[in-house]
Structures are given as C-alpha cells and as structure tokens.
UniProtKB/Swiss-Prot annotation:
Lineage, highest ranks first: Eukaryota, Metazoa, Ecdysozoa, Nematoda, Chromadorea
Protein name: Translational repressor ifet-1
Record's subcellular location: Cytoplasm
Ranges of biased composition (kind: Polar residues): 400-410, 557-568, 576-592, 690-702
InterPro entries on file: eIF4E-T
Keyword set includes Cytoplasm: yes
Length: 761
C-alpha cells in the first residue's frame, strides 16, 4: 500500500520526505550585469515567442504585460483599478493645461476631493460602527459627525460653554481654547464673506512645468586657512626650476651653449634658461641699459659673491618677485650702480642711455642736459591714454627671448638718438638770422642775449624762461621724466617697468633738475655781465663815430620850442573863454593841437639831430637837412611807408576837423553879432520912449521885438528860453495879459531861428 501510495497517490516530494530522504538541491546559478547585457543582445532574446499575441503590444511595438493583465482582470470580473490606469493618469498630468490642486494632485474637472466607491457608510463602519473604538476615546469617533445636524443655531439659543467669550473677548480665543478646538463659527463667517486666508501650503506652482527653488542643498562654507597661501607659494617655488645663467654665450638652436661671445652685455647677462625673467636685479638693470655690468663686475669682491650666492639660494624657496618687496639691505650691485650713475666724480656718465633720454651727453658732467623740449618721436596724448588703459597682460611674457631684449635696447637707443637730433634741430631753428640777409657769423650760433664765451650747455631760451618763471622748470623736468617712462614702456611692449628702474629714472630726473637750476643761475649772472659789456661798448662806439655830444641846445631851437608852447597856451585860453555849449568840441580841438605840437617837436628834433650829425661829420647843412641837387626833400620821404601813411591819415582828419571848427566858429560869431544888434535896437527904442513920454505909447511905429522883453521876469516861453541860451536876458512880466502888446506882430519860432541863423551878405 505504501508503494501504491508512493506510485499513485503521493507527490514524489512527499514520498521522499516520508521515506526519510533529503530533497535534491538545485545548483544556484547567478549572472553578472555584464553577462545579462550580453544575453540581452542574443538571438534567442531578440526572438518573440509565438504565444504572445500582437493585440497586447504597447506604443513601442513590443509586448506589454500590463495590457495583458488588464485583459485578464476584465475577463475574471475584477473591478479594481489596474496599474496601467494610474500610469496613464500620471502621463496625462504632464499636459500643459493640467493644473494642480492645493494638495498637489492633478485634476482636469476642477478642484475636488476624490470620490470613494464605498460611500460614507464604509467610513462609519471603518471607525467602528455601533461598537466601541478604543482608539478614539469613549465616543468611539462619533464626535466627528455629531455636529452635522445642528450646525445652525437660532439667535435665541445660547451657545455652549466652548463658544463663550467669542463676542467681545476674541483676544482669549487663542489662549483659552486648545489647539483642537477650532473657531467653527468664525470660519463659517469668513467662508461666506470670501475673505478666507490661504494656508502656507497653498502658495506655490500651479502647473507641473513651473520651476521651484530647492533649498537646503548648499555645501557648507569652507573656512579659509591662513597657512594655505604660504604653503602654496612655497610649493610653487619648489616646483619652479632654478634659472641657469649663461654669461657671455648665446644659446644655439640645438639647446647647447656656444663659445661665440655676445657683444651686447645686456643680452649676455639677461638671457637665462627657458627664456624666463632675469634672476637678479643686476641682470634686469643691465637688460634695460641702466648698468654697465662689465664695469661693475670688477668692483665685486668676495662678500658680494657670497651675498649673490645666498640670494640665489633664497630665490628657490620664495617667489621670484618677492625681492622687489622684501625689506632688506640694498644689493652691492645696486649700490655700485647708484654710485656709478649718481657719483660726484669727474668720470663720464655710467649710463649713456639715461643720459641721452634726459638730455645728457656722454662727455659732459652728470648734470649736463641738452635741454631739448620738443622730441621728434615724442608720445602723444592718445598713446599715453592707450598705454594707461591697456591693463590686459600679453600672451607672451616680456623679455623672455634674447631677440626681444635686443629689440628693447634698440628702441631705447633709437629714442635717445631721436631726442639728440631733435635738440640740435630746435637749436638750429632758434638761431637768429641777420636783418639784412647777410651771412651769419660765429656769434650767431649762440643765444643773442648770451656772451659767446659763456659755458652754457642747455638751451639759452629755456634757461631764460626758467629765470622768468621757476614753475616752468618743474614742469619741464616732470615732462622729461614722463616721456622717458613712456619710451621705456613702449620699448617693453606696453608692460609696466620694475620699481627699481622707475626709481633710477626719477633720480636721474632730480639730478637733471639740479643741473638746470645751476645752469639758470649761471645764465642769469652771465647775461647781466654781457648786457653791461654791450652797453659800455655801445657808448664807446657812439663817442668814436659821432664825437662829443653838444652840451646845450642852440638858442634858435629853444626860441622855436618856446614859440610853439606859447601858441599852445594861447589856444587853451581861447578855448576856455568859449561858451559852455562847445566844451566837448574845444576838448577835441585841444587834443588835436597837442598832437600837432608833438609832431612839430619831433620834426624839429629830427632836423636838429641831422644838423648836429652833419656838423660833426663835416657834411654841409644842405645835405644834412635833406637837400639833394638844390632840391629839398620832404621830411616824410625819410620816414618808413607805414609812418607816412599814418601821418597822411592824421593830417586829413585834422583838416576836416579844422573845417568843421571854422564853420561852427563863424556861425557863433554871426549869432553873437545878431544878438548884439538886437540889444542895441532895444536900448535905442527904450530911450526914445522915455523922451517922448506916455502919450506916444499907442503909436504903431514900434519895432518887431517889444520893449517889454528888456525887463527882467520869469522865463516861461520857448522864445525866452532860446534867447537865454544865447546870452539874452528875458524880460519881466507883471501879468499874464500884458506880456505882449497888441501892436506886436506875431512871429513863429522857425522864422526867428531862420532870421538869427541867416548869413548877412
């Protein structure tokens, strides 16, 4: 029976367990990810089984298990929502028109809570039904639905104890009530009025495409370690290769040294391995032409070599540019360079480049200067602004190649040569030319105010301007310093100069300023001496050529001068006696007479000088006075043309003025004569009336002008004003009706003026 069971009724596994045997273990087989990826591309994996219907294909054309599962659920009558619908709804939520609910759920038909198929009864049964739920207290969760039927309370009903204090005591609602007692009545009123405040979680994006700000993902700020920059500098300095000096040799194309000597010491001492910057200050100064290394190297002793070795060792541990900012003693090379350039010995200037830039000559003293103010290749304002504004570093570091170093030296030498040529050119143009067009003598090579023997190196015109205004000297020195700095910057491809080179230029500028000051003082003293010598020579020449000057003026000349002065005094007296109306005209006449007197005096003095010269030189008076071949020349022919033209214009203006004065004087004399005649007639008529008596007052043989005008009275009529202006006194009138008698013939003002101004024939 047992065997029958084993063979027919029992499962082989059960029979094995009952038989006491062990279950056979299937060997565990695992695949790695790489192996699975390889199996994915095999032919068996790419072949679709025949039992998979094409009706369940997805959008990608492959079999979709979700569609097949949904089909099986529909057949079996399962109404649960399949997973495919959830995925489709998520995909549909990505539409642009789909909005977000306040709970961030997608909705297409408005903002509402999701419906439940089981309804409210299911919720009530879930909370415990009629039984008791110990989780929700003694009420079993029924207090949640207790207030649904009695939300509205009439006005006559009293509120419960929980709602007491809401009227007039709203300040207690947050403190007396707990967090779980919500002010339901206040919420209902605010919902009806539409002034409900949105909660915090309601603010945010309204669509799924809106961008939101993610916070809390910032990395913590790292605290800067003070030791890191120093350690970083030390590491960089250790990594930097030490420069290899190649003195007196030029690197070949194969990278090996050649024994060919270099003529230019700046290139020989500045070229280093890899084309880097010079390692020492001496090489940098030699590169820019500020130091003669061949001359300075002879002065270096054992201590200097030890210091140079020490500086090379320290340069490997720190930055190569730190030597410009380190606070230590000056190097012996720099001291030797300063002493050679600024020393007070009588040797030539050790730096001919700076001497040329600042106007020094190689064979003169340190303070010698050419004084050329204008440089032919000077820098314009636009170039200076471009040089100051260009702060971008060049792609190739400057002075890294011997050719660039030689180019820098060549630019500096060319600039110094141009400055020297421009100084000579300016000095040549400033030489005075002789007025008669004759050849220039040797004395014309110097300034006209400077003696030929004076030792003046600078331009005398500049020294004269410096003597007049010392501010020009300071401006001139600053301009030279700026031009030298700009030239060095241009030669250095626009790169900034090292501080030591800039200091060298400034010290050379100060020495140039001191030299120009001493030259200015020498120029002023020698100029005064030269002026005194010239005055003495002129006096001697005057005594030799013209003889002894007369001690007194001849009596004839004095009489003529006195006569002219007396005529002028007489004219002044006449003009002072004229009426006040012509004061302005007399002043003009006085000025004209003074001018004529001055011209007469000048002519007389010129004639007298010609006469004295003729007498001293033995020439007759006729030739000395301008008489040639029996004909006397006009004095104006001896004057320049412009003076003759001015004199002719002055004479014409004077003649016109004299004509006007004569016509006005004639008119005045005629007017005065007319008035005097009228006064005489009035006096005669008055005498006749007194003799004849009062019986003849009514006769009609009276003159045109009434006798009452002779009486003194107030001036009220235009006729009386006109008569008073010419010196006739008006008459007095006792009454307004007796002023003019009935026998007087009326006469207009125009007729009276015509009669007075009429010229008698």
């Amino acid at each position: 029976m047992t065997s029958h069971l084993d063979d027919e009724g029992l499962h082989p596994m059960v029979s094995t367990l009952l038989g006491g045997g062990t279950l056979p273990t299937v060997p565990f087989k695992a695949y790695t990810r790489e192996r699975m990826m390889e199996l994915r591309t095999t032919k068996a994996s790419m072949t679709r089984p025949e039992n998979l219907s094409e009706d369940f294909n997805g959008e990608d054309g492959k079999f979709s298990p979700l569609k097949w599962l949904e089909h099986r659920w529909e057949i079996e009558g399962i109404k649960n929502r399949p997973m495919s619908k959830k995925i489709d709804s998520l995909c549909a939520g990505a539409d642009e028109n789909t909005g977000l609910s306040p709970q961030r759920r997608a909705f297409s038909s408005g903002c509402k809570a999701p419906t439940d198929d089981k309804g409210r009864d299911g919720e009530y049964e879930r909370l415990g039904g009629h039984g008791k739920n110990w989780r929700n207290g003694s009420t079993g969760g029924a207090d949640k639905f207790a207030s649904r039927g009695n939300d509205f309370k009439p006005s006559f009903q009293k509120g419960n104890q929980l709602e007491r204090g809401t009227r007039g005591a709203e300040w207690k609602k947050d403190t007396t009530r707990g967090a779980k007692f919500a002010p339901r009545r206040e919420e209902r009123l605010t919902s009806l009025s539409g002034s409900e405040k949105l909660p915090e979680w309601a603010d945010g994006p309204t669509t799924m495409d809106d961008m939101i700000e993610l916070r809390g993902f910032d990395e913590p700020k790292k605290v800067k370690n003070k030791k890191n920059p120093k350690e970083k500098k030390e590491k960089e300095a250790v990594k930097a290769p030490e420069p290899v000096e190649c003195v007196g040799s030029r690197p070949s194309s194969t990278g090996l040294k050649t024994s060919e000597p270099i003529d230019d010491p700046a290139i020989a001492y500045s070229s280093s391995g890899g084309g880097a910057l010079p390692a020492t200050d001496q090489e940098l100064a030699a590169l820019l032409g500020c130091l003669d290394i061949q001359k300075t190297s002879r002065k270096i002793d054992g201590d200097d070599m030890a210091w140079a070795h020490k500086s090379e060792e320290t340069a490997g541990g720190t930055s190569r540019l730190s030597r410009f900012f380190a606070k230590k003693n000056k190097s012996p090379e720099l001291d030797a360079m300063l002493s050679s350039v600024g020393g007070g010995n009588d040797e030539n200037v050790a730096n001919p480049m700076l001497a040329r830039l600042f106007g020094h000559s190689g064979g003169d003293n340190n303070a010698s200067s050419s004084g050329a103010g204008d440089i032919k290749g000077g820098m314009r304002l636009e170039d200076l602004e471009k040089g100051m504004e260009s702060k971008e570093p060049s792609k190739v570091s400057p002075l890294q190649d011997p050719s660039q170093q030689a180019q820098l030296l060549q630019h500096l030498q060319k600039f110094a040569k141009q400055q020297a040529e421009s100084g000579q050119h300016i000095h040549h143009h400033r030489q005075p030319t002789p007025p008669n067009g004759g050849p220039q003598h040797q004395q014309h090579l110097h300034h006209p105010m400077v003696h030929p023997g004076m030792q003046i190196i600078a331009d005398p015109s500049l020294l004269a301007s410096f003597a007049q205004n010392p501010v020009i000297l300071n401006a001139y020195v600053e301009n030279q310093l700026q031009e030298a700095v700009n030239a060095a910057i241009r030669a250095n491809n626009g790169q900034q100069l090292p501080p030591q080179l800039h200091e060298q230029l400034r010290m050379a500028s100060m020495r140039n300023k001191a030299f120009l000051q001493s030259q200015t003082l020498t120029f002023v003293s020698l100029q005064q001496q030269h002026q005194n010598i010239q005055q003495h020579q002129q006096q001697q020449q005057h005594h030799q050529h013209k003889g002894r000057t007369p001690a007194m003026i001849p009596a004839s000349v004095q009489r003529q001068l006195q006569k002219s002065s007396s005529n002028a005094d007489q004219k002044k007296e006449k003009t002072s006696q004229s009426p006040p109306e012509s004061n302005q005209e007399t002043s003009d006449a006085h000025n004209q007479s003074d001018a004529m007197n001055q011209l007469k005096k000048l002519h007389m003095q010129q004639n007298y000088a010609n006469m004295v010269q003729a007498m001293n030189s033995g020439v007759g008076w006729a030739r000395g006075n301008g008489v040639v071949n029996g004909q006397q020349q006009h004095p104006q022919q001896q004057l320049p043309p412009n003076v003759q033209m001015l004199m002719a214009q002055h004479q014409q203006a004077q003649m016109q003025h004299l004509k006007m004065m004569m016509s006005r004087a004639q008119q005045q004399h005629m007017l005065m004569a007319k008035i005097a005649q009228m006064q005489q007639q009035q006096a005669q008529m008055a005498n006749m009336q007194e003799r004849q008596g009062p019986s003849h007052n009514q006769q009609q043989h009276q003159p045109v002008v009434p006798s009452e005008l002779s009486q003194v009275g107030p001036i009220q009529t235009p006729l009386e004003k006109l008569l008073a202006s010419v010196g006739v006194q008006g008459s007095q009138f006792t009454g307004s009706g007796d002023r003019i008698p009935s026998s007087v013939r009326p006469m207009s003002l125009e007729d009276l003026e015509k009669q007075l101004t009429a010229v008698p024939k």
